[in-house]
Amino acid sequence: MKIIKYLPYIILGVVLLYGFKSDTARDQFQKMKTLTQIIRLVSENYVEDVDMNEILEGAIIGLLDKLDPHSNYISSEQSELISQQFDGEFEGIGIEFTILEGYITVISPIPGTPSDRAGLQTGDKIVRINDKSAYKITQKDVLQKLRGPKGSSVDVTISRPGIDEDIAVTLVRDKIPIFSILASFMIDNQTGYIKINQFSRTTVKEITESLSELENLGMQQLLLDLRNNGGGLMDQAISIVDMFISSRDTILFTKGKIPESNEVFRARKNNMDKNYPVVVLINRGSASASEIVSGAFQDLDRGLVVGETSFGKGLVQRQYPLRDGSTARITIARYYTPSGRLIQRPYEDIGEYYANLGENNREANDSTLAKKPVFTTKNGRNVYGGGGITPDIFSELILDFNKSTRNILSHPDRLTFKFAGEIKNEIQEQYDNFDDFARFYDLNGNRKEKFLSWLQAQEIEFEVEELEEYWDYIQNQILSNVAGRIWGKEFLYKKLLEADNQAQDALIHFDEARKLIGL
C-alpha cells in the first residue's frame, strides 16, 4: 500500500523540517516511528483483510478528537456538503423532505426552485426516480439521485394524496438557495419575528431584507429566535449585531496562540435607524455564532435575552484544506463577549461534554448563578460567565409529556404531519385566509373523534385520557402543519408560536427590553 511505503520518508521529512529541538521532539519522533510500525504490522499480519485507508482516517480523527470537542477531520465528501451549507446554495431540485413509509415525502418545495415551478406540493411522495422504484430509499441515496449539475434533468413519479393516478414530472436541476431564515413575519401589529436557522454567507443579506419588510409593516419591536441555531460564520454574526449598535463598541474579541488569532471586532458606528427593543430567544441548542449575537446584545444592553443557558461553544476553528480535498478543522482561538466572558464551557472530560448539556444545573436560577463568575454589562448590569450565555430571563421549554402524547409527537411516521394532509382539503375549501382559520378552526368534538379513529386505523396505541391532557398542544401541531401545507412555512411557524411557552414568555418582557435602550 503506497501510503505505508512512504510513511518513513514522511516522518524523516518532518524531522528534517523541525529538527530535534528538545527531548519532546525526540519522543514525538519515536512515537511516529511506532505508529508506522503498527500500521505496517496490521497491514501485513492482521487475520482479515482490512481497509487501511479507513484505518488511517480513523487515526487522523482520533488525533484531532484528543484536542477539544470541535477540532475535527472532514472527509472530501463531507467538505463539499459543508461548503454548500455555508455558501448558501447547492444544485438540485429544491425540496425539503423526510422519508415516510419508505418514500421521499415532500415537506415543502423551496420557492422559486424546479420543484416549486413544477407544482410539487407538501405531502407528495416520490415513488420513482428515473423510472426506478424509490421505495426504501436512504437519505444518502436521495442526495445522490436528486442533486446534480445545473441544467441536468431527473424524471420523478409523484403519488399525491386524493389523486388516484401517479404524476410523472421531469425536473431540470438548478441552483438551490439554502435559506438562513426559516421564518419572518409580524406576530401582531407591532411585534416582528425572525427565526435564524444558521449563519451562512447569505445571512446578512437575508436579515437585512427581512428587517426592511417588517419595518415597512410597522414593526416596533423584534423577537429574534436563535433557538437550536448551531452557529456558522463568525463574520455574519458580527455584522448582524453591528446593524443594531450605534457606537464603536466591541462586539467580540478572540485570543489564541498565533498572532493573527488575537483580534478585536468593533461596531462601525453605523447610521441604521434600528432603535426598537429586541428580545433574543436562545436555548441549549444555540451555539457558536448564535452565542456571539446573544452575548453581544446582552453585554451591550442592546437586547434582553430570554430562554435557557446556551450551548457554550466558544472555540474558533480555522479550516485547513488538505491535498486530497479533505479538511482539517483546528481550533486556533477562543471567543469572548464584550464584557470578557469566555463563551466556551469546560471540556476536561470530552466524553461527558455533550451528555452534560441536559443537566439541570445549567438553569439560570439563584442557586446556580451564585456559582458562576460575575461580569458587568455596558450599563452596569450583572451577567454571568462559566460557559454559554446565561439568559436575563430563564424560560424552559415545557415538553414533559405523558407516554401516549410522546408517542404521537415523536412517531417516525410524523403522525401530526400526515393527519394534516387528511384534513387539508376540507380546511382549504372552508377558509380563504390564515387569520380566519387561526381564529375559528379547532379540532374539538367530532373532529377530535376523527383524529382518534384515524390513529386507531394506523394501529397506533394510545390512552384517550392521556391525549386529553395535552390535546391543546397536539391539535396545535396538527393545525400548524395544515397552515404550512396551505399557506407556506411562514404560517406553520406563526401557528406553532401559539403553543410555544418560551416564545410567549419572551413576548411579555418587551418592557424590560425597552428600558435597556432608554425608551
Question: Predicted regions span which residues?
Answer:
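Cleft-lining beta-strand/loop regions that shape enzyme active-site pockets
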Residues: 3, 20-31, 35, 39-52, ...
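Hydrophobic membrane-insertion alpha-helices, especially the h-region
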Residues: 5-21
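Amphipathic alpha-helical interaction segments
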Residues: 37, 54-58, 62, 239, ...
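Extended, small/polar residue-biased N-terminal targeting/export presequences
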Residues: 46-107, 153-173, 177-183, 496-507, ...
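Hydrophobic beta-strand signal
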Residues: 127-128, 304, 329, 344, ...
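A generic structural motif
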Residues: 157-161, 336, 376
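Polar, glycine-rich mid-to-C-terminal structural blocks
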Residues: 289, 301, 312-373
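Conserved functional hotspot residues or short segments at active or partner-binding sites
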Residues: 342-343, 347-519
